[in-house]
Amino acid sequence: ACVLCNRVKMKGEVDAMIVGKQSILFEENVYIEETACVAGQKESEGPLGKLFDVVVEDAMAGMENWEEAESTLQQLAVDKLLEKWDGKKEDLRYIFAGDLLGQLIATSFGLMQYEIPMFGLYGACSTFGEALSLAAMTVHAGYAGHVIALASSHFASAEKQFRYPLEYGNQRPPASTWTVTGCGAAVIGTEKGEVCIRGITTGKVIDFGVKDSMNMGACMAPAAADVIAANLEDMQKDVTYYDCIITGDLGAVGKTI
């Protein structure tokens, strides 16, 4: 009887957190305890340049190929994260991480040395949002005290994977988007910090049939619009409720769409 009562209680708590069709609103706040960000030379020249923890001027990061370079970006990010964070590596229960490459090779080789249980994620440009969402759910449910959420990309490895290797010398049209060379990582936990994850809204696969592999902004814009609309509907808010609504870089074309 006690077990049944506990199950009923747990179901009630879960039901209370399920909001609308696509959202969860956590009963207890989950916090971003610390962050680390590594970027390439081109990224450092942009408006966010002064905010990056580490800037890697050598696109090869001292390695022999682009994939190894991306793995190095991940290692630099995790090392900087552990340096900044008050906790210890042994306190980390899981890593939720991913990249843009087949078989997540940058992540698999990049994070192997840390010997932390890892969930490999492939969500393309949504990977970091996916990592934050799953990390927050895991911590809130009590399955971990501290979790790393991480995602990386590299312009050259992504071009090789999805379009044309740089050595091919393909011409890029004006609407083409430029994949970031960098890595972002965060520790998610219950220790109170400046930023909390109050809830999440998970997007759906939205395909408007865009065929141009050079114009990722136009491809992603409908999905971004759909999940923003879902969040506003589920949470019963309007756009004025938020200080900022931030997406990945959709480019001028994607932003207009």
Task: Identify the meaning behind each predicted range.
Residues 122-149, 188, 222:
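Active-site-proximal alpha-helical scaffold in enzymes
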